[in-house]
């Protein structure tokens, strides 16, 4: 309490409570393109690890106690030749093990195909807040 000129003032002013910063997520990606190369007449695979593509998520803010969930979605495949062969690790801060397959059974050699996949990480903190971040993986398929 403050006494001023015979008056009593209580509850003078207030201070906002400061909590944790909002949950946020960023991705660190080394390299970015995947190339699938192989002969006509079968299925050829290539993984992101084979090309030195490392994708790491960094969460900050929120309530802590982070859990990670990774997904991949085909965004483009003009010739319909690509598919996910293996999803890889989907519940850690780093995403690895994604393998893309290319069907070359209808090719005769010399063809080039392009596609892309959205790699998405969703982080959830211990208070169930979520944040997401995306990366586009470009895929080129070359049939020898």
Which residues are covered by each model-predicted region?
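Enriched but not universal
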Residues: 1-28, 142-143
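Surface-exposed, flexible coil segments in extracellular/virion-facing regions
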Residues: 72-106
């Amino acid at each position: 309490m403050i006494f001023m000129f015979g008056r009593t003032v209580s509850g003078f002013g207030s201070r906002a409570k400061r909590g944790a910063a909002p949950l946020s997520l960023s991705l660190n990606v080394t390299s970015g393109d995947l190339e699938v190369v192989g002969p006509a007449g079968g299925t050829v695979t290539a993984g992101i690890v084979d090309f030195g593509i490392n994708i790491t998520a960094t969460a900050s803010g929120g309530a802590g106690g982070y859990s990670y969930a990774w997904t991949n979605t085909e965004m483009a495949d003009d010739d319909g030749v690509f598919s996910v062969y293996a999803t890889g690790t989907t519940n850690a801060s780093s995403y690895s093990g994604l393998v893309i397959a290319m069907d070359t059974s209808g090719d005769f050699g010399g063809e080039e195909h392009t596609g892309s996949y959205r790699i998405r990480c969703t982080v959830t903190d211990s208070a169930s807040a979520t944040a997401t971040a995306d990366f586009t993986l470009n895929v080129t398929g070359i049939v020898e």
